[in-house]
Amino acid sequence: MSAVPLRNNKPGRAEVRSITVLGATGSIGESTMDLLRGAPERYRVEALTGNSNVQGLAKLAREFKPGFVAVADPARLNELRDALAGTGIACGAGESAIIEAAARPADWVMAAVSGAAGLKPALAAVDRGATVALANKECLVCAGDFFMQRAAQAGACILPADSEHNALFQALSSGNREELVRVIITASGGPFRTWAAADIEQATLAQALKHPNWSMGQKITIDSASMMNKGLEVIEASYLFALSPDEIDVLVHPQSIVHGMVEFSDRSVVAQLGAPDMRIPIAHCLGWPDRIAGPSARLDLAKIGTLTFEAPDFVRFPGLRLAYDSLRTGRGATTVYNAANEVAVAAFAAGQIRFGAIARLVEATLEHWTRSGNQAPLTSADDAIAIDHDARKTAAGLLPQIAAKAS
């Protein structure tokens, strides 16, 4: 039994739904809060968490009046308590408090804590059978099989909250699993879509951060420039929808209007279109199984005029190839891929390596891990976190060597 409901056969919900937002002060969290703000009669906030933006978190808490608020940094607990003095809102700090927030009895949980730190809180929500809007990549990239099995066992409902997987989720409902031929994830191509390989190699941080369509944080914008983000999305799609690598294609689509497509055995291709606005897929998750009115601009195809598509270049963007390789390898390779990429992106942002060295560091880390013989199925969150930790350590150790080769 899948934890992702590919057929909408549930009745709509008229009652007020209780909501928890993990990562409320991040970009996904802010979009979620914006949607909640627009429909106070439909939603009641149970708990909110944030990383280190205590004042932003406190402001949201005063507005939405949740029962519990938690900040990830334990050293900020007193600051949070002071900011919420007189409200009667319970406060917590640290990993245990974030997990406590996720475990509270909310109908719907937005899992938007970034990084490996988001895995255990998401599992806490899953274990009580909640509906979880999943915006944390690491839950799937680092522990996909384990995470989805646990969700199915608990009777949890996993709704993909990012634009591409939400598009596939919507399109897949048009047919049955045995009728599926492939899914197609679209990619903008990023700022270097038309650049020569030699120019991509030397790209600066400022150039990498000039995404043509989306407004995102630094790390994901760099991932978009390298197409590592699309590699991560291929991995996520495989675990979310139980697809083999051969059933997942990537298509470059510079306008970012078509977010995902599904081809069925009768050769019909069903696509989901929308403006590049994260509130659209989040609204779909928030309203599911109904649809709710959202604040996003309506799509005007006549104004856009032209939609174009092209094949991805695995030579200029080797990070995409490495994602497919790690997915086929399995047994923790996707965890290594993600961890090494995070180390590489941080090194590039700090000026330690060239842009082109990001993929080389990821590949070197994967090769080192393969030679180590430490591959084994993941059976717990701690297994995934241990592989993630070891891969980061390996990547950091290989960093001087990769940097020297590029100089």
Curated annotation (Swiss-Prot):
The protein's annotated pathway: Isoprenoid biosynthesis; isopentenyl diphosphate biosynthesis via DXP pathway; isopentenyl diphosphate from 1-deoxy-D-xylulose 5-phosphate: step 1/6
Keyword flag Cytoplasm: no
Key words, A-Z: Isoprene biosynthesis, Manganese, Metal-binding, NADP, Oxidoreductase
GO biological process, one term: isopentenyl diphosphate biosynthetic process, methylerythritol 4-phosphate pathway involved in terpenoid biosynthetic process
Cofactors, names only: Mg(2+); Mn(2+)
Ligand binding (NADPH): T25, G26, S27, I28, N53, N136, E138, G217
Assigned EC number: 1.1.1.267
GO molecular function: 1-deoxy-D-xylulose-5-phosphate reductoisomerase activity; manganese ion binding; NADPH binding
Protein residues bound to Mn(2+): D162, E164, E233
Binding site residues for 1-deoxy-D-xylulose 5-phosphate: K137, S163, E164, S188, H211, S224, N229, K230, E233
Reactions listed under catalytic activity: 2-C-methyl-D-erythritol 4-phosphate + NADP(+) = 1-deoxy-D-xylulose 5-phosphate + NADPH + H(+)
Protein's UniProt keywords contain Nucleus: no
SUPFAM superfamilies named in the record: 1-deoxy-D-xylulose-5-phosphate reductoisomerase, C-terminal domain (SSF69055), Glyceraldehyde-3-phosphate dehydrogenase-like, C-terminal domain (SSF55347), NAD(P)-binding Rossmann-fold domains (SSF51735)
Class of this enzyme: oxidoreductase
Transmembrane regions listed in the UniProt entry: none
Pfam families: DXP_redisom_C, DXP_reductoisom, DXPR_C
Summary of the function given for this chain in its UniProt record: Catalyzes the NADPH-dependent rearrangement and reduction of 1-deoxy-D-xylulose-5-phosphate (DXP) to 2-C-methyl-D-erythritol 4-phosphate (MEP).
NCBIfam families on file: Dxr
Homology family: Belongs to the DXR family.
Protein name per the record: 1-deoxy-D-xylulose 5-phosphate reductoisomerase
Species, as recorded: Bradyrhizobium sp. (strain BTAi1 / ATCC BAA-1182)
Taxonomic classification: Bacteria, Pseudomonadati, Pseudomonadota, Alphaproteobacteria, Hyphomicrobiales
